Design a protein with these regions (language model features):
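Acidic, PIN/NYN-like endoribonuclease modules and their adjacent C-terminal/linker elements
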Residues: 1-4, 98-129
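Short, well-structured N-terminal submotif of metal-dependent ribonuclease cores
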Residues: 1-38, 50-62, 66, 126-129
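Alpha-helix N-cap/helix-start capping motif
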Residues: 14, 23, 40, 75-76, ...
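A generic structural signal for short hydrophobic patches within well-formed alpha-helices
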Residues: 16-17, 43, 114-115
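Alpha-helix C-terminal capping segments
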Residues: 27-34, 64-67, 82-86, 99-103, ...
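Active-site neighborhoods of divalent-metal-dependent phosphate/nucleic-acid chemistry enzymes
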Residues: 70-112
Length: 129
């Protein structure tokens, strides 16, 4: 595992959920998962999605923790980065993911539209499907 958080790939909520459910592309995510981190905001998105689908909150938390992701805090500097994306109509969760990916240098998502919106500002967005 790479101890330098600033160079570790960031998974968005769609990536975490794909791993949990064995969705298409999960095999690509498994290859980088040991080094990946998840922003606390995106972890909250994952838990909210699981609970909204009927899973008890404690079970959702246990399912997330079973993946052994390091969950990183959403820091004030990242809030400033995420604010740059608000005019593009991007959701809060996606803005927080993009800020974390920009800080760390790469991110994994299923949302191909994110890469086209920002003119390459995020150094390396990877798409798992």
């Amino acid at each position: 595992m790479n101890p330098n958080k600033a160079s570790r790939p960031v998974f968005d909520a769609s990536a975490v959920l794909a791993l949990m459910h064995g969705e298409p592309g999960a095999d690509r995510l498994k290859a980088v998962q040991p080094d990946a981190v998840v922003s606390a905001v995106n972890a909250a998105e994952v838990l909210a999605k699981l609970v909204s689908r009927g899973m008890p909150a404690a079970e959702a938390q246990a399912a997330y923790e079973a993946l052994h992701f390091e969950t990183t805090p959403f820091e004030p500097a990242m809030a400033a980065i995420s604010a740059r994306y608000v005019r593009k109509g991007v959701s809060l969760g996606d803005r927080c993911f993009l800020a974390a990916a920009e800080r760390n240098g790469s991110g994994w998502t299923s949302d191909r539209d994110l890469g086209t919106l920002f003119g390459g500002r995020v150094p390396a967005l990877n798409y798992f499907r």
